[in-house]
């Protein structure tokens, strides 16, 4: 071995790392911090509208916007066999996760003259399974949050991880609370009876939810927390759709309708947007232009024809095992994309429109995948199910192997060991990391690209699904949201071929360095990174990055989101005027 094969580095014990001076942080905050409560200007059982005039264009708004509302609804059905009440909230029944937004077909937000729209119900249950689950669960004091881990709620009723469970199901870590532990203001009509009795139960509850709509933030990103300014008018419209995901229960045949006797038929009460306003200190000088990271999540749906057979339980006398029902390969439609997304999310589920309160947020397990992208065919054909799970975790999924694979082992006292179906696969792939790209392309590249894929799935559940399933693709397209003097614009697909090639000669960051510096949440994974230091500076968040121009014209700093990353080199010609 030659000494040129390695270099020597001195590593000093922390105890011995003494110094004759320390750095002392001088914390600079806002001159005024004003929590603002904004009432809806119009409200019905089909839509809610807000129109908010900001104090001034110089006022900084927190991008963590909360909606607070009372929900009034009625659950009707007949008491099930072996039950004495229609609903046993905290055991077999509970609210769904983020119940208000689960009602929204679309959320439309207009900032100044620019409008962004998201198909909320179509994408939110998938997006919840990405990023840090612990940070998502921090909202469980203001809204039920827990996501489903079981395919069917009946399997979860006696389990400690029952998503519909009560406070008694909370273990030593109180951060993880089941949805049945959330306080319901009023339950009326859930009187005792016998099996077959018809009941209508009126429920009233107040929730406070973070809006899951970019450029707003809803997790706790470490690199993407800056506010935005340059706003004159903020308008939001919530279009209300079906109630089939509002309430969840293992009791079959329930119907859920908006409004109840306590609200005179109205579904919403005291509906407000909670926004935090910040007034800068007189010494804070910032550009008129403000740039923040942005992402959009368009979805592409392919309806599936045919019957997906049920799984079969095999009893060998000592244990029960599941044999999955098999289904022929499912082919997606050929999808035209005008940019290369950061990530793609693929799943197969019962059609959202066909789901009922008895259906968990579950997806058929994916065992094989084949991708055709940009004239390259047969990508990932040899990947095993375990490979696909590891790729999903690397792309930000918080699913466990037991959840992704669709089956887990359970032991109940005095019963044989048995296998039960779990919530199934949300497959996530990062472009350029898991799906190969040519040297002139990267996530965010503009162009015309064709994507087509096929999946093989299994069904471990005891239910066959006939002509009521769908294959869903969600693409994560990132870019920037630019505000200046009362106007705003969104930009995605901001990289040209020359931008990608010129970046090849720049000093590089390792992926692990980026994750360490900017965090690991879904909103930290946007390509418009904020908070990265100049390569080789040895500082994180220092200098200009996150400093005097934090959240300003350079989106967090000279390198991060500014002149280099997202600007003149990596932002392309049409972005240069906005980021320099």
Per-region residue spans from a language model:
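Long, intrinsically disordered low-complexity tandem-repeat segments
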Residues: 540-570
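Short, low-complexity Pro/Thr/Gly
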Residues: 1-542, 574-579
């Amino acid at each position: 071995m030659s000494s040129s094969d390695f270099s020597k580095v001195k590593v000093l014990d922390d105890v011995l790392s003494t110094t004759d001076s320390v750095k002392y942080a001088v914390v600079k905050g806002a001159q005024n911090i004003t929590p603002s409560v904004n009432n809806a200007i119009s409200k019905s059982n089909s839509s809610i509208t807000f129109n908010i005039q900001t104090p001034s264009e110089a006022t900084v708004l927190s991008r963590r916007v909360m909606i607070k509302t009372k929900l009034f609804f009625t659950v009707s059905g007949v008491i099930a066999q072996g039950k004495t009440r229609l609903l046993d909230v905290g055991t077999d029944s509970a609210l769904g996760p983020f119940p208000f937004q689960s009602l929204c077909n679309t959320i439309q937000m207009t900032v100044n003259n620019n409008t962004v729209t998201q198909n909320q119900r179509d994408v939110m249950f998938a997006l919840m399974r990405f990023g840090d689950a612990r940070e998502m669960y921090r909202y469980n004091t203001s809204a039920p949050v827990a996501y489903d881990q079981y395919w069917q709620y009946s399997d979860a009723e006696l389990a400690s991880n029952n998503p519909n469970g009560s406070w008694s199901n909370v273990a030593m870590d109180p951060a993880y609370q089941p949805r049945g532990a959330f306080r319901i203001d009023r339950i009326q009509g859930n009187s005792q009876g016998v099996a077959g009795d018809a009941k209508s139960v009126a429920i009233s509850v107040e929730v406070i939810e973070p809006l899951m709509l970019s450029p707003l933030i809803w997790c706790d990103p470490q690199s993407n927390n800056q506010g935005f300014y340059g706003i004159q008018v903020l308008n939001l419209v919530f279009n209300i759709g079906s109630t089939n995901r509002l309430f969840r229960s293992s009791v079959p045949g329930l119907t859920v309708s908006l409004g109840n006797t306590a609200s005179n038929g109205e579904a919403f009460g005291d509906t407000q947007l909670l926004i935090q306003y910040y007034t800068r200190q007189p010494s804070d000088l910032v550009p008129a232009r403000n740039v923040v990271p942005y992402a959009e999540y368009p979805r592409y749906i392919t309806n599936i024809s045919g019957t997906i057979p049920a799984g079969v339980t095999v009893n060998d006398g000592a244990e029960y095992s599941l044999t999955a029902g098999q289904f022929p390969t499912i082919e997606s439609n050929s999808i035209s994309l005008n940019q290369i997304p950061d990530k793609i999310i693929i799943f197969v589920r019962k059609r959202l429109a066909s789901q009922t309160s008895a259906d968990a947020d579950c997806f058929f397990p994916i065992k094989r995948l084949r991708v055709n992208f940009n004239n390259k065919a047969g990508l990932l054909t040899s990947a095993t199910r375990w490979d696909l799970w590891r790729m999903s975790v690397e792309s930000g999924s918080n699913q466990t192997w037991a959840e992704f694979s669709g089956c887990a082992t359970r032991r109940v006292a005095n019963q044989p060991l048995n296998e039960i179906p779990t919530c199934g696969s949300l497959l996530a792939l990062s472009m350029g990391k898991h799906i190969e790209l040519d040297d002139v392309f990267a996530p965010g590249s503009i162009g015309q690209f064709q994507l087509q894929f096929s999946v093989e799935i299994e069904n471990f559940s005891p239910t066959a699904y006939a002509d009521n399933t769908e294959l869903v693709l969600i693409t994560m397209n990132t870019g920037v949201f630019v505000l200046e003097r009362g106007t705003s614009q969104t930009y995605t697909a901001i990289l040209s071929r020359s931008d990608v090639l010129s970046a090849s000669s720049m000093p590089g960051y390792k992926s692990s360095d980026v994750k360490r510096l900017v965090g690991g949440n879904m909103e930290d994974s946007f390509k418009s990174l904020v908070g990265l230091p100049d390569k080789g500076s040895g500082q994180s968040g220092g200098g200009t990055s996150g400093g005097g121009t934090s959240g300003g014209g350079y989106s967090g700093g000279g390198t991060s989101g500014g002149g280099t990353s997202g600007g003149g080199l990596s932002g392309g010609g049409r972005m240069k005027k906005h980021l320099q």
